[in-house]
């Protein structure tokens, strides 16, 4: 079976990309256990709790990220440089337990996957 990586690189609620990526991730987890999730660039904002999507008339899907553990999705990484660039602390309690990696280490980890889906 191919190893599949899901890369979240867009901010939540501005487009449907994050919600669609999460839906695809959960659906794919029913078919394979060999997948991982990466949060880079503005995608790191997907990890923040306390968002108020109703203020922009968007659906609150961020809480659904908390289900990753129930779906046995345990390989989650976040780009440490992206966090710093956006003024976020790696010690922030995110909705998903994601391991911070520097950009080079994150690229090396991502290279281990056969299929990369970016949202």
Curated annotation (Swiss-Prot):
List localization entries: Cytoplasm
| Disulfide-bonded cysteines | none
An example GO biological process term is:
tRNA processing
What superkingdom heads the lineage? Bacteria
Gene Ontology CC annotation, any one = cytoplasm
Keyword field: Cytoplasm, tRNA processing
Identify the Gene3D superfamilies for this entry.
DsrEFH-like
Q: What quaternary arrangement does the UniProt entry report?
A: Heterohexamer, formed by a dimer of trimers. The hexameric TusBCD complex contains 2 copies each of TusB, TusC and TusD. The TusBCD complex interacts with TusE.
In terms of HAMAP family, this protein maps to: Thiourid_synth_C (MF_00389)
- Family membership: Belongs to the DsrF/TusC family.
What biological function has been recorded for the protein in this entry? Answer: Part of a sulfur-relay system required for 2-thiolation of 5-methylaminomethyl-2-thiouridine (mnm(5)s(2)U) at tRNA wobble positions.
Protein's name in the database: Protein TusC
In which organism is this protein found? Answer: Shigella boydii serotype 18 (strain CDC 3083-94 / BS512)
């Amino acid at each position: 079976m191919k190893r599949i990586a899901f890369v979240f690189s867009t901010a939540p609620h501005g487009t449907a990309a994050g919600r669609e990526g999460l839906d695809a991730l959960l659906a794919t987890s029913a078919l394979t256990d060999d997948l991982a999730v990466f949060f880079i660039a503005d995608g790191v904002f997907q990890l923040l709790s306390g968002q108020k999507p109703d203020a922009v008339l968007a659906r609150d899907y961020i809480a659904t990220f908390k289900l990753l553990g129930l779906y046995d999705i345990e390989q989650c990484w976040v780009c440490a440089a992206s966090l710093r660039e956006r003024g976020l602390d790696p010690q922030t309690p995110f909705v998903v337990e994601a391991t911070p990696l520097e950009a080079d280490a994150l690229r090396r980890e991502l290279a281990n996957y056969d299929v990369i889906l970016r949202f």
